[in-house]
Amino acid sequence: MNTSCEPILKPTLNKYVVFPIVYEDIWKMYKKAVASFWTVEEVDLSKDFSDWLKLSDNEKNFIKHILAFFAASDGIVNENLAERFYSEVQISEARCFYGFQIAMENIHSEMYSLLIDTYILDSKEKNYLFNAIENMNCVKQKANWAKKWIESKNRTYGERLVAFAAVEGIFFSGSFAAIFWIKKRGLMPGLTFSNELISRDEGLHCDFACIMFKHLLNPPLNSVVRDIIIEAVNIEKNFLTEAIPVKLIGMNCDLMKQYIEFVADRLLLELGCDKYYCSKNPFDFMENISLEGKTNFFEKRVSEYQKMSVMSNKKDNVFSLDIDF
C-alpha cells in the first residue's frame, strides 16, 4: 500500500510530539481511555469461589473455556498493536491511544489469568487453560484467524483495521453477553464486574478502530469489509453454539447467533456499509451494555470508574475567589 496516499500513515517527525492536536476526535478517544483506567486490585474476588462451587459442571466448563480464550486473546491483540499498528500509524494522537491500549490489554490479560488462578485449584488444569491456544481447537481457530492478519504482508492497514475491529467487536461480544447472563443470576460478582470494565474498554477500542477507518482516504471496498466481518461472524457462531455451546449455561444458541449478527450489523454500519443480517438484539439485558463504548459505559458509567478531571477542560479547573458568599 502506498502510505503517502494516507495522511495518518505518512511518515512525519511530528509523531514524536503530542501538541498541537490535529485530530480532535482521535485525541478525545485517547482521553476517554485514560479516564477509564483501572487495575485488577480494584476487583473484589473474595465471594467468587463460593459461587463457583455452586455452578454445575457444564457451567464451570463453559466459563473455563471463555476465560481461557480471553486470557490468550488480549496478548494477540497486543502483538498486533506492538508489531503493526503502532509503527504504521504516524499521527501522535493515535499512537497515544495505541500505547495506552497496550497497557489496558495487559491488565485485561492479567485479570483473566487471575480469574483462572482463583477458580481452578489443580495446577495441571490451570496450565492447560493458560495454554489454550495450543490445547483447545476452538480457541486455536479464533487465535489463528487473528494471527493471520498480524502476519499478512499483502493486506492493507485498512483491511487489518477491520479485522481487529471484528476481533474486539465480534469475537468478544458473545462471550461478554454470556457472562452478563450469569450476572442476572446474582453469581460471581468479581467475574461479572471485571466483565463490565473489560467490555467497556473493548467497546472503546472497537469504536476507535471505526474512527481510524473513517480517516482513511482510500478505505477497503465495502465488499471486502463485509467479507471480513462475515468470516468473523461464522467463526464466533461456531465457537458459542458448537464448540462451547451457550446452552451449557441455559442460553438459547439460536438467540446467541442472532445476537452476534446484530453486533456485526452495527459494526458494518460504523464502517460505512449496509446491514447484512438485519437481525434485532434478542437480549434485552444487553441493551444498555452493548459494545458501543459511547454513552453506555462512558457517560452513564455503570461501574463509575473514571479518573477525576481527566475528561475536563482547562477552563473547568480555574481557581477563583470571586464567588458570592
From Swiss-Prot:
The keyword Oxidoreductase is assigned to this record: yes
Coiled coil start-end: none
The EC number(s) this enzyme carries: 1.17.4.1
Free-text cofactor note: Binds 2 iron ions per subunit.
InterPro entries: Ferritin-like_SF, RNR-like, RNR_small, RNR_small_AS, RNR_small_fam
Protein residues bound to Fe cation 1: D74, E105, H108
One record GO biological process: deoxyribonucleotide biosynthetic process
Pfam entry (one): Ribonuc_red_sm
CDD domains on file: RNRR2 (cd01049)
Active-site residues (renumbered): Y112
Keywords from the named record: Deoxyribonucleotide synthesis, Iron, Metal-binding, Oxidoreductase
Any one GO molecular function term: metal ion binding
Protein residues bound to Fe cation 2: E105, E168, E202, H205
Major enzyme class: oxidoreductase
Cofactors required: Fe cation
Catalytic reaction annotation: a 2'-deoxyribonucleoside 5'-diphosphate + [thioredoxin]-disulfide + H2O = a ribonucleoside 5'-diphosphate + [thioredoxin]-dithiol
Function: Ribonucleoside-diphosphate reductase holoenzyme provides the precursors necessary for viral DNA synthesis. Allows virus growth in non-dividing cells. Catalyzes the biosynthesis of deoxyribonucleotides from the corresponding ribonucleotides.
Complexes and interactors: Heterodimer of a large and a small chain.
Homology family: Belongs to the ribonucleoside diphosphate reductase small chain family.
Name of this protein: Ribonucleoside-diphosphate reductase small chain
